[in-house]
Amino acid sequence: MATARSLGLLFFLLLTSDEETTEEPRNVCRRLQEGHEYDTFDLNDTAQCFTKCGQSEHSPCDVGNLQRYWLNYESYLLENSMETVDMPFVKALIQNISTDVSEDLLYSLMLSQIPRQVMQGEDEPADGVRLPKSLFGALPGNRSAVRLAITVLDIGAGNVFKGPKLLEDKGSSVLNNRMVGLSVGQMHATGLSEPVEITFSHERQPPNVILTCVFWDMAKGDWDSHGCSTVPGDGRTVCRCDHLTFFALLLRPILDLATAQTLTRISQAGSAVSMIFLAFTMVLYVAFRFSLQRFKSEDAPKIHMALSISLFLLNLTFLINVGSSSQGPPASCWVRAAIFHYFLLCVFTWMGLEAFHLYLLAIRVFNTYFGHYFLKLSLLAWGLPVLVVIGAGSSNSYGVYTIRDQENRTSLELCWFQKEPALYATVHGYFLVTFLFGAVVLALVAWKIFTLPSVTAGKGQGPTWKSVLTVLGLSSLVGMTWGLAVLTPLGLSTIYVFTLLNSLQGLFIFCWFIILYFPTQSTTASSSGTARLDQAHSVSQE
């Protein structure tokens, strides 16, 4: 009996040992590193590994192997006779397509559904992919048909297909954790004459979130946007790419809660400082009006003063808007947004008129007389924004404007635009016209400032510090600092510089006013081109 019991115990231990031995390779992440058998068991394991990969030290995971596993999966689909794959984390459609198709092919990519072809006469899906007919006609070889695979993969919340950039950029994510793979006949299709279009539908994103169309670069093991363009729309984004691979839409927040609060404080402090110095500028102007005859007749100081007044009122309405609650009556928020919009447009207009006046004095020079010159400028600068605001208000464009951080928490609310098309047309477009005109005029004037001294003196001397200060002062008058929002990438450093410079524009104008109208003895005696330009800037137009 003892022997029988011993044998029984030994047999039990052997069974137990064997069971433990066979269980270990079934670790979902480890098994996927050992082969590429695309059966149902492996696919289900992959879904679990997506979640566990990189989140637990006890779940061995090679991110690179997992990513290669799925990049090779489309090749597996093209080589086999299956037509669809329908699993919770992967949906795929495989079709034989004629290479002489007569029209573009459209496929629906709705969530939780297998991709399907949209036939003629059906409504265009919210999520879909459009393949141009030229794609199939340009394939090498004399083929009558080719295999097409469209794969929608849920990459989960783990580290798979996140890439170094996405992992380092806190708060960034792939829209819905979804990748769309496109493959035709196992060919490396690049440089397409007509781009493929992948449409992603989504909720309206906070204004501090950037949407970028990207593809997975197998060589880098990271996301890349080369060859893809992003076309934003109302509730959807269209990605146009000149090659076939796995695509996704990245959401990258610019501001977190702490950064938004810091920028708000900088703006408030800068606006307060600007208002103080703008008030000093206006007091000096009034004093000069009574003591200097030139201030009663010359137009340049009047234009400077009009710009100062509009900037003062803009900063005042900004402080009121940011400091007031947007939860009051809708009519109150509408009025605050309209007033803020009006003074912003007035500032843009006066900066454009500063550039126009500078053009008359420094570029055109002759035949610059206009009757009632300043009155006409005032009617344009104060009247045109009224028409724009009325148009925006009649389309119900004003409302609560919310900025959220990457955790979808409200970081700032103010009364502003609630419709992006109106914002782009009446603010971005309006500013772009005045900015481009001012930039051209400033470039011509700067060229004159830096070349005139060497021409008049017959020497090749370089620009003096005074010439540089003159150009910087003129750039503040015509609003060049606002161009940071147009000509530079929208990064965190750019936002800080933009906020600081524009909130202190009133200080810069005050310094320019002092330098221009309080010349030192050496400046008065100077024969440099800068001094002559300053003198020209004070010529009367009446």
Swiss-Prot record:
Keywords: Cell membrane, Disulfide bond, G-protein coupled receptor, Glycoprotein, Membrane, Receptor, Signal, Transducer, Transmembrane, Transmembrane helix. Cortisol binds at residue 502. This is Adhesion G protein-coupled receptor G3. GO terms for cellular component: plasma membrane. Belongs to the G-protein coupled receptor 2 family. Adhesion G-protein coupled receptor (ADGR) subfamily. Residues 1-18 form the signal peptide. SMART domains: GPS. The record marks 244-245 as: Cleavage.
